[in-house]
């Protein structure tokens, strides 16, 4: 198709690691727009390895079922779908600094 690549962008829009309509529109519109390769955001391979609680996940078959819908749509538009696999390492966090804690500060007792 072409060499235009949509690089992974953290969207922080998943619930329990599942892609949703936001991802369908965000990624699908890039495929419709003509990009040759469209990569998802960083997808955690285990729930404890997420960068944030709102990250995309691929630690269960159910996650792949949802992602397959998006991938089939993008492929139907002529784009090659891809995924960025991720693990945040020893600094991984499933703590959100936003709800009720706008500073994002974690007390030492909490981790």
State the predicted function of each range.
Residues 72, 86-111:
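Non-globular sequence segments
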Residues 1-88, 95:
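N-terminal capping/small domains of soluble enzymes
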């Amino acid at each position: 198709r072409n060499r235009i690549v949509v690089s992974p962008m953290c969207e922080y829009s998943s619930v329990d690691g599942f892609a949703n309509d936001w991802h369908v529109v965000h990624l699908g519109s890039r495929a419709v727009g003509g990009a040759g390769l469209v990569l998802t955001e960083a997808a955690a391979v285990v729930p404890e390895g997420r960068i944030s609680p709102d990250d995309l996940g691929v630690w269960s078959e159910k996650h792949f079922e949802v992602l397959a819908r998006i991938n089939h749509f993008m492929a139907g538009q002529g784009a090659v779908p891809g995924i960025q696999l991720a693990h945040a390492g020893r600094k991984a966090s499933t703590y959100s600094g936003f709800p009720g804690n706008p500073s994002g500060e974690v007390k030492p007792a909490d981790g």
